[in-house]
Curated annotation (Swiss-Prot):
Key regulator of entry into cell division. Acts as a transcription repressor of E2F target genes, whose activity is required for progress from the G1 to the S phase of the cell cycle. Hyperphosphorylation by CDKA-1 prevents the binding to E2F transcription factors, allowing G1 to S phase transition to operate. Forms a stable complex with E2FA that functions in maintaining cell proliferation through repression of cell differentiation. One of its GO terms (biological process) is regulation of DNA endoreduplication. This is Retinoblastoma-related protein 1. It comes from Arabidopsis thaliana (Mouse-ear cress). Residues 980-1004 have a biased composition (Low complexity). PANTHER family: RE32990P-RELATED, RETINOBLASTOMA-ASSOCIATED PROTEIN RB -RELATED. Highly phosphorylated by CDKA-1 during G1 to S phase transition. Once hyper-phosphorylated, becomes inactive and unable to interact with E2F. Residues 608-727 are annotated as: Spacer. The lineage of its organism: Eukaryota, Viridiplantae, Streptophyta, Embryophyta, Tracheophyta.
Length: 1013
């Protein structure tokens, strides 16, 4: 079979002298680093030179000069992070020179967005070298994900602050006074003062747990301070006129309550944060606080002064410059990787343009995929630029009656659910849950509460366990960290008990018994439930220091374990906000696409029982999981740890038969089948939002008992059929993988505008690969296999579809990560045994040619050319099928996405229409755009005639289409939302599409899509 050729780029010269000289110049002349740091950077460059040469075409634009600059940045950042850690451990002493990531990027003329887009390749490909030089824990010490999360959070918070400032204060170009220049300068200074005071609050008061919700409260507290200190003439609102302010009797407006109403904040929490901000003003700026009730100033007119603090001359035009200098110095003294002041300077090229994926940060919002970092050219034209909407009048607050949802506002709304629904619950099992716990073979209430305390303490440690992550200089920091951790533990614990009780009730209904001993005494089940509860709390507050999969590492479970409870968790908590449901769904998708296939996954412990033929390869690759650390070991770690990694530090393991073993480990080879536990997965959907499109019969069926999902793999399946629990679990797991692959294949087919036959062939090919060449997915991403399946089917079908086109369209998929096609894992030892020498990770074209095709060629040949023979189809059509109807697809049922394309040739879209919407949407002028099942599209016709007419129109593209639906490729798509705007908008879209198509000349073979906004 013909091989696809990877692009050729000039390698780094063998001696690398020119590159080393360039790196040395940057270290010595630009960054002024000391000799030891320069030597360390040169050593790391020398060790990774071979990797750099092999990665030239995959980094940045592929030019040697740009690739070198990126590689230098990766090396300097690694040396900075890892050598500083060495100094802290007392192993070495670095020089007096201090540098951070922003200085590195400025020296190399790179921006933060591009740096973090390319960094994962360096982490993957140079990981072995970094491990040899800096130790096995180098990745945790590098903190690349934490710094990226910090950048994303600051981008969101700066926009949140900018938006709030513009709502309450005038923009400088809206001031038409004679001294407009001075007024503009003051407003800019006030804007900068607020941001610097927020950074001081964030660095001093939120040192370790810089979560988005707490920081959002910090932004709101800064707005409160600005409102009562900025002169009234700069306000963009009138307290007396605004309906959004909460009035407190005759005393005036309750400012804190009003801000909580506007921003969905907690009044108690906001008052605490305001007090901390006031303390910083007193400590750093040396301003004397006074109770607002004792001050006479027009800034407090019509505002209830109770509980407010006022600082004389804090933001007067004569003193603000001095305050700015003091805050700048305070910020400079607190060293960090990012210069967080740049986020209010829209002209700073360091921020970069484009978007940075927030997947690692799990930022949820109104859309599943969010451009967390928009282009500064659009967003930061001016920090105080006026609203573009004509509705933005002088009274900015009353004019903006409903703010559009943002990631920050969504986080605040979700936190409100925790505050109002979960927090009022008792932090112990309810009487209903206690009934189930006491109905077991013995009363296990104490066991459940003790486990919850230990596991949640491990996930949310006190400051003594996490001091190495801290910053800031004020003594109240540790106390606030401990309070924050205790609040999060309580929230997770209450949520855990609430959902556990609901699950027990459902399980008792299925089993017709209250004794759930098998489930409730299972250690792994409870840890999965606690991890899921804690992850929801972390996702709500969006922390920087505890990103997923932190809950897996700290509880001792694996990705495969957690995937067993996610869908059931969603099902049994009805009040769960939509954004948290989406988070769990996307998390399950992330687990299934790659994490369950990683080395050390407990999935392999079931796979060698269900598929004994794979046991040898699994053992040779060292893929099996280690036993799960015991609860006593985790408890001892909490009591004596100095903050080290939980998973890697635990030595004691469970030996009791009732405690299910298995934690991810790249080192242990477990060959005792009797120790393999916990692998039955009884859930039906990998991604509930997208894949829970089951038929009515299936949706009414009771789910299998939960306890069977956590039974020993070698145990016979209680449901019968002669299978072990491992075989049943792997079959269900493969079904979920196939469903996830079906959705992604369907999305790619629509983007590439391929036929239904190609879609079915790609899906069948993937099914065969999963079932018969399962090892191709070991330590890889399922998208890598899907992309190879597309190209393989294209070649066997003699289609003119290149890998370049496939990857180009894959980039537009919401789940796309460049690392998927730039870095595919290959077993270097196996390659050497076969006489090939190469790196551990290669690009997808090399993987396709050297690994994929040799393994699947017999399967691909079986598919044969994809035929579109109408005669064959007619001879084999099912009995009773309507003449001319397309054949029934073997492709699995996927969700009804609105609108859904049903033809690869014509622009035909189908959107589900509820009966409640029909009368409102379908008027006489728009009815012809819809074909409703059971309702005729023409007078005096039957539904069967309508269906036949639709088939004839689809199958006869040359017929006269007078007064019929327009199926031309240039016709505009009509969706539900467009119908409400009547025919004018539809005709405009058709004319626009037609002019675009006619002006484009030759049509491009690839489908063009609008970019995400």
């Amino acid at each position: 079979m013909e091989e696809v050729q990877p692009p050729v780029t000039p390698p780094i010269e063998p001696n690398g002298k020119r590159s080393e000289a360039s790196l040395l110049d940057i270290c010595e002349k630009v960054l002024s680093l000391d000799g030891s740091t320069c030597d360390e950077a040169l050593k790391l460059f020398t060790e990774t030179k071979r990797i750099l040469s092999a990665s030239m075409s995959n980094i940045g634009s592929g030019t040697r000069e740009e690739v070198e600059r990126f590689w230098f940045a990766f090396i300097l950042y690694s040396v900075k992070r890892l050598s500083v850690r060495k100094e802290a451990d007392g192993l070495s002493v670095s020089g007096d020179n201090e540098f951070n990531l922003c200085q590195i990027l400025r020296a190399l003329k790179l921006n933060i967005v591009d740096f973090f887009k390319e960094l994962p390749q360096f982490v993957v490909k140079a990981g072995s070298v970094l491990g040899e030089l800096y130790g096995a824990d180098w990745e945790n010490r590098l903190q690349a994900k934490e710094v990226q999360a910090n950048f994303v959070h600051l981008s969101l918070l700066s926009k949140y602050y900018k938006r709030g400032f513009r709502e309450f204060f005038l923009t400088y170009d809206a001031n038409a006074e004679k001294n407009s220049a001075n007024s503009s300068t003051y407003l800019l200074d006030s804007y900068r003062f607020g941001w610097l005071l927020f950074l001081a609050l964030r660095n001093h008061a939120f040192s370790r747990f810089k979560d988005l919700v707490t920081c959002s409260n910090g932004v709101v507290s800064i707005l409160a301070i600005l409102i009562i200190h900025v002169p009234c003439r700069f306000r963009n609102f009138s307290i007396q006129d605004s309906s959004r302010f909460v009035k407190k009797g005759d005393k005036g407006v309750d400012l804190v309550a009003s801000l909580c109403k506007i921003y969905d904040a907690s009044e108690d929490e906001l008052r605490i944060v305001i007090d901390k901000a006031n303390n910083l003003v007193e400590t750093i700026l040396k301003k004397k606080p006074s109770p607002a009730s004792e001050c006479q100033t027009d800034k407090l007119d019509n505002i209830d002064p109770d509980g407010l603090t006022y600082f004389e001359d804090l933001l007067e035009e004569t003193s603000i410059s001095t305050s700015l200098i003091t805050l700048e110095k305070d910020y400079y003294d607190g060293k960090g990787e990012l210069d967080e002041r740049v986020f209010i300077n829209e002209e700073d090229s360091l921020l970069g343009s484009g978007s940075l994926s927030a997947g690692a940060v799990n930022i949820t919002g109104v859309k599943r995929k969010i451009d967390a970092l928009s282009s500064p050219a659009r967003t930061f034209i001016s920090p105080l630029s006026p609203h573009k909407s004509p509705a933005a009048k002088t009274n900015g607050i009353s004019g903006a009656t409903k703010l559009a949802a943002t990631p920050v506002s969504t986080a605040m709304t979700t936190a409100k659910w925790l505050r109002t629904v979960i927090s009022p619950l008792l932090p112990k099992p309810s009487p209903g849950l206690e009934h189930f716990l006491k109905s077991c073979d013995r009363d296990i209430t104490n066991d459940v509460t003790r486990r919850a305390h230990i596991i949640l303490e491990a996930i949310f440690p006190n400051s003594s366990l996490g001091a190495q992550c801290g910053g800031g200089s004020l003594q109240a920091v540790d106390l606030m960290d401990d309070i924050w951790a205790e609040q999060r533990r309580l929230e997770a614990c209450k949520l855990y008990y609430r959902v556990l009780e609901a699950m027990c009730k459902a399980e008792a209904q299925i089993l017709h018994a209250n004794n759930l001993n098998s489930l409730l005494t299972n250690e792994r089940f409870h840890r999965c439930m606690l991890a899921c509860s804690a992850e929801l709390v972390l996702a709500t507050h969006k922390t920087i220091t505890m990103l997923f999969p932190a809950v897996l590492e700290r509880t001792g479970i694996t990705a495969f374990d957690l995937s067993k409870v996610i869908e059931s968790f969603i099902r049994h908590e009805d009040s769960l906000p939509r954004e948290l449901r989406r988070h769990l769904n996307s998390l399950e998708e992330r687990l299934l696409e790659s994490m369950v296939w990683e080395k050390g996954s407990s999935m392999y412990n079931s796979l060698i029982v269900a598929r004994p033929s794979l046991a040898l390869e699994i053992n040779q690759l060292g893929l099996l999981a280690e036993p799960m650390p015991s609860l006593d070991a985790i408890a001892a770690l909490i009591n004596f740890s100095d903050g080290a990694n939980h998973a890697s530090s635990v030595q004691k393991h469970e030996t009791c038969p009732g405690q299910n073993g298995g934690i991810r480990s790249p080192k242990r080879l477990c060959t005792d089948y009797r120790s393999i536990l916990v692998e039955r997965n009884s859930f039906t959907s990998p991604v509930k939002d997208r894949l829970l499109a089951l038929g009515n019969v299936k949706s009414k069926m009771l789910p299998p008992p939960l306890q069977s999902a956590f039974a020993s793999p070698t145990r016979p399946n209680p449901g019968g059929g002669g299978e072990t629990c491992a075989e049943t679990g792997i079959n269900i797991f493969f079904t979920k993988i196939n469903k996830l692959a079906a959705v992604r294949i369907n999305g790619m087919v629509e983007r590439l505008q391929l036929s239904q036959q190609i879609r079915e062939s790609v899906y069948c090919f993937f099914q065969h690969v999963l079932a018969q060449r399962t090892s191709l997915l070991f330590s890889r991403h399922i998208d890598q296999i899907i992309l190879c399946c597309f190209y393989g089917v294209a070649k066997i079908s003699q289609m003119s579809l290149t890998f370049r086109e496939i990857i180009y369209n894959y980039r537009k998929q919401p789940q796309c990560k460049p690392l998927v096609f730039r870095s595919v894992y290959v077993d270097a030892l196996q390659c050497r045994r076969q006489g090939r020498i190469g790196p551990d990770h290669v690009d997808i074209i090399t993987f396709y040619n050297e690994i994929f095709i040799p393994a699947v060629k017999p399967l691909l040949v079986e598919l044969g050319p994809v035929r579109n023979d109408r005669a064959v189809e007619a001879n084999n059509k099912p009995e009773g099928q309507c003449p001319g109807s397309p054949k029934v697809s073997v492709f699995p049922s996927v969700p009804d996405m609105s609108p859904k394309k049903v033809s690869a040739v014509h622009n035909v879209y189908v959107s589900p229409l509820r009966g409640s919407k029909m009368d409102a949407l379908i008027s006489h002028s728009t009815k012809s755009y819809y074909a409703c099942v059971g309702e005729s599209t023409h007078a005096y016709q039957s539904p069967s005639k309508d269906l036949s007419a639709i088939n004839n129109r689809l199958n006869n593209s040359s017929s006269n289409r007078k007064r019929t639906l327009n199926f031309d490729a240039e016709a505009g798509m009509v969706s539900d939302s467009m119908v409400a705007n009547s025919l004018n908008l539809q005709n405009q879209n058709q004319n626009q599409n037609g002019s675009d198509a006619s002006s484009s000349g030759g049509a491009a073979p690839l489908k063009t899509e609008p970019t995400d906004s």
